């Protein structure tokens, strides 16, 4: 039986073997792996890109004080990003499942059409959910637009729900019972690593995050992001947009914004993502799209 740690390592080795560069987690609070710069920014423009990474993702509203066996405010996604998209991406995905002990020939694996959209990122794509014996474990997306910019070429993105897959492999009903790894001191569980954090962060997300302070921080991040994008510094501009996005999610968890205000906040974050995306494209174009030049690819 694979531990949570060994499952991740096995998937990483699989995709490295198939030409992906191993990236490290983004050191920002993000709502999903798609927010990582290796996905969002690298999907823009003609330059090729092949990467795999694990990203801790935060959704404050999903916290349950560490008491729900399946709901987390912080969890892990593994993303594979291939641009231009590989024609055999689905077959490779099924092979990766086999590598961790899930045999597609004996399990009920279904691809259920589910086109993807992220309003705050100004992004959408054609996609499918992957269901294993009735449980969603992954998402395929072929990006059509990111930051309001059409994707040429199309980027293929594959997202693994690591906790769900591990719960199936280890046959446990609570995420906190997952075996993270075995050390010389004994078994280390997911709960040992993260349950206290789930409890404490839920108190912060739902009860103690200062609403006025969150609003002020959002305004400051928005202002700085727009300034940096205007100055053609897309990477720090994008990081400020990510800060604004997380602050919006905290305000949402605190129930501090109405339905109408919520839509306005989404549009404000979307404008930041779009400005950063446009600045990224322009700066890479000014550099003559260096990854295209290095690999002799026609722009």
From Swiss-Prot:
Coiled coil: none
Superkingdom classification of source: Bacteria
Annotated compartments: Cytoplasm
InterPro entries found in the cross-reference section: aa-tRNA-synth_II/BPL/LPL (IPR045864), Gly-tRNA-synth_heterodimer (IPR006194), Gly-tRNA_ligase_asu (IPR002310)
One cellular component term from this protein's GO annotations in UniProt: cytosol
One matching Pfam family: tRNA-synt_2e
Primary localization: cytoplasm
Keywords: Aminoacyl-tRNA synthetase, ATP-binding, Cytoplasm, Ligase, Nucleotide-binding, Protein biosynthesis
EC number: 6.1.1.14
GO terms for biological process, alphabetical: glycyl-tRNA aminoacylation
Family affiliation: Belongs to the class-II aminoacyl-tRNA synthetase family.
PANTHER family cross-referenced by the UniProt entry: GLYCINE--TRNA LIGASE, CHLOROPLASTIC_MITOCHONDRIAL 2 (PTHR30075:SF2), GLYCYL-TRNA SYNTHETASE (PTHR30075)
SUBUNIT field: Tetramer of two alpha and two beta subunits.
Protein's UniProt name: Glycine--tRNA ligase alpha subunit
Gene: glyQ
């Amino acid at each position: 039986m694979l531990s949570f740690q060994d499952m991740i390592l096995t998937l990483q080795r699989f995709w490295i073997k198939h030409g992906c560069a191993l990236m490290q987690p983004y050191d920002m609070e993000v709502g999903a792996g798609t927010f990582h710069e290796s996905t969002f920014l690298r999907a823009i423009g003609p330059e090729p890109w092949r990467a795999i990474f694990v990203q801790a993702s935060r959704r404050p509203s999903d916290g349950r004080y560490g008491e729900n066996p399946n709901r987390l405010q912080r969890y892990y996604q593994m993303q594979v990003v291939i641009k231009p998209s590989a024609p055999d991406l689905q077959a490779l995905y099924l092979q990766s499942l086999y590598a961790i002990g899930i045999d597609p020939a004996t399990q009920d694996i279904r691809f259920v059409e589910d086109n993807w959209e992220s309003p705050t990122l100004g992004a959408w794509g054609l996609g499918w959910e992957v269901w294993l014996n009735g449980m969603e474990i992954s998402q395929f997306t072929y990006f059509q637009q990111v930051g309001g910019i059409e994707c040429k070429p199309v980027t293929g993105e594959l997202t693994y729900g690591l906790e769900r897959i591990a719960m199936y492999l280890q046959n446990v009903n609570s995420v906190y019972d997952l075996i993270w790894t075995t050390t010389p001191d004994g078994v280390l569980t997911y709960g040992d690593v993260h349950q206290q954090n789930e409890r404490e962060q839920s108190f912060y997300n739902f009860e103690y995050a200062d609403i006025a302070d969150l609003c002020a921080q959002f305004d400051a991040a928005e202002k700085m992001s727009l300034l940096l994008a205007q100055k053609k510094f897309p990477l720090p501009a994008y990081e400020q947009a990510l800060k604004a996005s997380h602050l919006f999610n905290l305000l949402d968890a605190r129930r501090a914004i109405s339905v109408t205000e919520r839509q306005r906040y989404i549009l404000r974050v979307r404008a930041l993502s779009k400005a950063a995306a446009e600045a990224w494209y322009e700066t890479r174009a000014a550099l003559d799209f260096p990854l295209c030049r290095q690999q002799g690819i026609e722009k």
